[in-house]
Amino acid sequence: QTAGRTLSHHSWAEWAEIYLELERLEPSWTDRLLELKETDLTGISLPDAMVWEPALEQLLVYFLYRQMPLALDDGEYEGRAAFAVLSFAMIRRLLLVHIALHGSVVLADLIEIARQYSAEIEYSDENVEILLYRIQKVL
């Protein structure tokens, strides 16, 4: 939820579909998105929130740090804040999928998921613009 609005008009399976429509570089990223779409996460949680939440919090701070200065140029404050939250939530959700499929998770898994997200989404102006457009439609 950002600025009193929500991105939950789409389920995680629907967000996975949206991400699958974007340009992709690595087949392993496609695999992750398909796993997100198909994996039941009932009962799955981070094993030790005291360990994981600070790292994930810093990930959100990073996305806000990267997106909000861009909003000064394009005026998309709400959309860019929502993009930062969606990016954080997507990586967190993919981490939960990893736990569901592999039974455990280590910091290197988070780093790899974040690296893939950055390469596939964050550093593709076209993908970011498409996601900003899709976000604006649900805000």
Enumerate the language-model features and the residues they cover:
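Hydrophobic, aromatic-lined core segments that form the binding pocket/scaffold
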Residues: 1-139
